[in-house]
Curated annotation (Swiss-Prot):
InterPro entries: PSI_Ycf4_assembly. This is Photosystem I assembly protein Ycf4. Keywords: Chloroplast, Membrane, Photosynthesis, Plastid, Thylakoid, Transmembrane, Transmembrane helix. The chain crosses the membrane at residues 23-43, 86-106. The keyword Chloroplast applies. The keyword Membrane applies. Seems to be required for the assembly of the photosystem I complex. It is found in: Plastid, Chloroplast thylakoid membrane. Belongs to the Ycf4 family. Pfam families: Ycf4. It comes from the Eukaryota. The lineage of its organism: Eukaryota, Viridiplantae, Chlorophyta, core chlorophytes, Chlorophyceae. It comes from Tetradesmus obliquus (Green alga). GO terms for biological process: photosynthesis. It is a multi-pass membrane protein.
Length: 205
C-alpha cells in the first residue's frame, strides 16, 4: 500500500482567500480616496479663510496643487466642516480596517491543516492563530479516541456547513475552515471519505 492509503492531509486556507485580498485592497484604496478628499478640503478651506493668503500669493508663487485646491473651493468644492471632517473620519476608519485585514492575511489566521495518520496512529489538528501565546494551535489525538464523524448543516442567510470530529468524552472538534463554507456536495464527499478512512460511523447525513 502507498503513502496515501495511510496518511490523509486536508489543508485549510484560513484568511488567505481571494475574497479577503479583494476586499482588503478595495477598502484600502477607498479609504485613501476619502482621506485625500478630506485633507484637500482642509487645505483649500484654510487657504481661503486665511487673511494672509493673498499676501503670500503676491510675494511667492504657491505650489501648483495648492493653487488648484484654493480655486476649486471657490467653485463649489466641499468645506472641511462638516463634510471634509467626516471624509477624514471615515477614511481613517477604513484605513485602520484595511490594515487589520492585511495583518490577518499576513498571519493567515485560521489557516493550517488536518492530518490523519494511520501509519503512526495519530490525528493532528494544526491552525495558525493571532500573534502571541496561542500563535500555533497544534493538537494531537490518537485514532482510537475517534468515535465518529458528525456533519452539521445550518441553512439560512449565514449558512454553515461544518464537519466535527467526535472524540471520547463527548468532545467535538471542528475540522473545517471558517468564513468560506464548502458546498453540500463537498461536505458530503469529504465527510464520507474521512469516515471510511478512519472506519468510524458518519452522523448528520
Amino acid at each position: 500500500m502507498n503513502q496515501e492509503n495511510f496518511i490523509r492531509r486536508y489543508f485549510i486556507i484560513g484568511e488567505r482567500r481571494f475574497s479577503n485580498y479583494w476586499w482588503a485592497t478595495v477598502i484600502l484604496i477607498g479609504s485613501f480616496g476619502f482621506l485625500l478628499t478630506g485633507i484637500s478640503s482642509y487645505i483649500s478651506t484654510s487657504l481661503n479663510s486665511t487673511a494672509l493668503s493673498s499676501n503670500i500669493e503676491s510675494q511667492m508663487q504657491l505650489p501648483f496643487f495648492l493653487s488648484m485646491l484654493k480655486n476649486s473651493n471657490s467653485t463649489g468644492a466641499i468645506n472641511f466642516f462638516p463634510q471634509g471632517l467626516l471624509m477624514c473620519f471615515y477614511g481613517s476608519l477604513g484605513f485602520l480596517l484595511s490594515i487589520y485585514w492585511w495583518c490577518l492575511i499576513f498571519w493567515n489566521v485560521g489557516g493550517g491543516f488536518n492530518e490523519f495518520n494511520k501509519k503512526e496512529n495519530f490525528i493532528r489538528i494544526f491552525r495558525w492563530g493571532y500573534p502571541g501565546k496561542n500563535r500555533k494551535i497544534d493538537l494531537y489525538y490518537t485514532l482510537k479516541d475517534v468515535e465518529s464523524i458528525r456533519v452539521e448543516i445550518l441553512q439560512g442567510f449565514d449558512s454553515q456547513r461544518t464537519i466535527f470530529l467526535k472524540l471520547k468524552g463527548n468532545r467535538e472538534i471542528p475540522i473545517t475552515g471558517i468564513g468560506q463554507p464548502l458546498t453540500l456536495q463537498e461536505i458530503e464527499k469529504q465527510a464520507s471519505e474521512l469516515a471510511n478512512f478512519l472506519q468510524v460511523s458518519l452522523e448528520g447525513l
